[in-house]
């Protein structure tokens, strides 16, 4: 098959979950002999990029501006893919749902992965939230097949729009590579890790305020950035005490080294479906604490310690886990076991592959002379 992946910032990953998804799934498709093209935004591409060279990159214009960047780049990508020889399009992000029609008009099946409920993010207010609500509505019918990454999101689309969807999650295997902590000045197994884009709905302020009340000499390592709001980052830094280390965004071997050697991982995102950072922490054999939302509970279940959105509860849960090495060891083992059983990239890629084949076969049955490649 010839597969196009559209709607992310591109590969290699320098931003977030969809980019990690595109990076991993494209390589798995290439492993199976498929021709894969990832459409990448110009602002996120560098001459020295390291990525799987079996995957073709197509660079499209971008604005690197919060409100229009996604639409501008995806419009150009959708037009280009419409005139390409790709057999199927994997479109990412609910905000891109209006552009599903462009390749569909040219006979290409479009699978839309909507992720979570983006319109609820605090950064989208007023007109922005209304536009995303419109995109959410369009996502319920604009693609050939809708994909949600959690049962909670599937149930939402079914209840609100009457739209069926296929639930396909994410993978979490630890890659091979340099997993040393050289340069971080951290002791393996003796730091708390928080990973997220630094935005209000990811609750870095909750974690930082709670940490001030935890009695421990462990560092809290905050990994993440916000290229669209530097002021918010400065406000978060003002909440940290001398035990907090802000690293900015980290990808590749450095990111995986921090995951692998953390003693505790605290997760505080409340908007979205399945979050890659959470399942990656589980795969890394971490003791996990997570904010109690339906999506997070579906992901981690009893393999982590859940807390409600309050400083008091998070402080108490952190203190309890930090004070008991045996509990940390038990939590880490359960998290790893759950990740290995439920979140494997090869299985995820195979599920998408079968879905693509089904859609292409259905299309070809309506078009005499066509056959599945």
Where are these regions (language model features)?
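Aromatic "clamp/platform" in nucleotide-sugar-dependent glycosyltransferases that forms part
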Residues: 270
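Membrane-proximal helix-turn-helix segments that form the acceptor-binding/catalytic region
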Residues: 79-82, 105, 128-146
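Conserved donor-binding/catalytic core segment of Leloir-type glycosyltransferases
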Residues: 4, 183-215, 221
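Nucleotide-activated donor-binding/catalytic signature segment of Leloir-type glycosyltransferases, i.e.
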Residues: 233-256
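A short, well-ordered alpha-helix in the C-terminal region of glycosyltransferases
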Residues: 327-342, 351
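An aromatic- and histidine-rich active-site surface loop
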Residues: 68-82, 86-115, 273
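Conserved acidic donor-binding segment of nucleotide-sugar-dependent glycosyltransferases
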Residues: 304-312, 320-326
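Short hydrophobic beta-strand element within catalytic cores of glycosyltransferases
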Residues: 287-290
């Amino acid at each position: 098959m010839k597969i196009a992946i559209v709607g992310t910032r591109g590969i290699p990953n320098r931003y977030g979950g969809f980019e990690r998804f595109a990076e991993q799934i494209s390589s798995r498709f290439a492993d199976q002999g498929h021709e894969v093209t990832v459409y990448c935004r110009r602002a996120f591409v560098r001459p020295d990029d390291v990525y799987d060279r079996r995957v073709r990159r197509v660079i499209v214009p971008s604005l690197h501006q919060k409100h229009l960047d996604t639409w501008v780049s995806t419009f150009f990508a959708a037009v280009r893919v419409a005139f390409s020889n790709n057999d199927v399009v994997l479109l990412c992000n609910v905000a891109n749902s209006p552009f599903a029609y462009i390749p569909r008009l040219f006979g290409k099946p479009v699978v839309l992965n909507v992720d979570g409920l983006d319109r609820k993010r605090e950064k989208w207010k007023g007109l922005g939230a209304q536009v995303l609500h419109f995109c959410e509505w369009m996502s319920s019918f604009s693609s050939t097949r809708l994909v949600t990454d959690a049962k909670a999101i599937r149930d939402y689309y079914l209840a609100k729009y009457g739209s069926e969807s296929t639930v396909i999650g994410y993978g979490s295997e630890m890659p091979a590579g340099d997993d040393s902590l050289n340069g971080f000045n951290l002791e393996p197994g003796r730091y708390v890790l928080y990973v997220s884009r630094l935005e209000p709905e990811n609750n870095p302020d909750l974690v930082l305020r709670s940490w001030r009340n935890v009695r421990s000499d462990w560092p809290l390592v905050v990994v993440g950035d916000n290229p669209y709001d530097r002021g918010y980052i400065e406000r978060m830094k003002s909440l940290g005490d001398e035990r907090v280390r802000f690293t900015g965004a980290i990808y590749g071997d450095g990111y995986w080294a921090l995951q692998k050697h953390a003693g505790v991982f605290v997760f505080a995102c409340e908007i979205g479906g399945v979050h890659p950072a959470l399942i990656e922490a589980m795969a890394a054999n971490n003791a996990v604490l997570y904010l109690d939302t339906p999506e997070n509970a579906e992901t981690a279940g009893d393999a982590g310690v859940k807390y409600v959105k309050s400083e008091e509860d998070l402080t108490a849960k952190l203190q309890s886990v930090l004070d008991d090495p045996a509990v940390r060891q038990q939590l880490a083992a359960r998290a790893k076991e759950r990740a290995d059983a439920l979140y494997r990239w090869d299985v995820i890629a195979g599920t998408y592959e079968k879905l693509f084949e089904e859609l292409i076969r259905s299309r070809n049955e309506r078009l005499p002379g066509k056959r599945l490649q």
